[in-house]
Curated annotation (Swiss-Prot):
Record protein name field: Delta/omega-plectoxin-Pt1a
Organism encoding this protein: Plectreurys tristis (Spider)
The keyword Lipoprotein is assigned to this record: yes
Subcellular location: Secreted
Signal peptide bounds: 1-20
Organismal lineage: Eukaryota, Metazoa, Ecdysozoa, Arthropoda, Chelicerata
Length: 77
């Protein structure tokens, strides 16, 4: 009987630990989005293909770049 109780406790602990683990997601990068060219939040991505000359590019370390906002030199569109 003790072995059955221990087995149930161990299986329950295994189930809880397995469900608590976070899923790892691999983010696909285009060549111009690799970490060396895009580390941290910045607005200096003018030469990147993800934005045009009037939009700011923001890249978070380990994520794809996002084009947000309009540069002051372009005014409102």
């Amino acid at each position: 009987m003790k072995h059955l109780i221990v087995a149930v406790v161990l299986l329950s602990a295994l189930a809880i630990c397995t469900s608590a683990e976070e899923e790892q997601v691999n983010v696909p990068f285009r060549p111009e989005e690799r970490i060396g060219e895009c580390a941290g939040w910045n607005d200096n991505c003018d030469k990147r293909s993800c934005c045009d000359q009037c939009h700011q590019c923001r890249c978070k370390f380990g994520s794809n770049c996002r084009c947000t906002g309009t540069k002051p030199s372009c005014g409102k569109r």
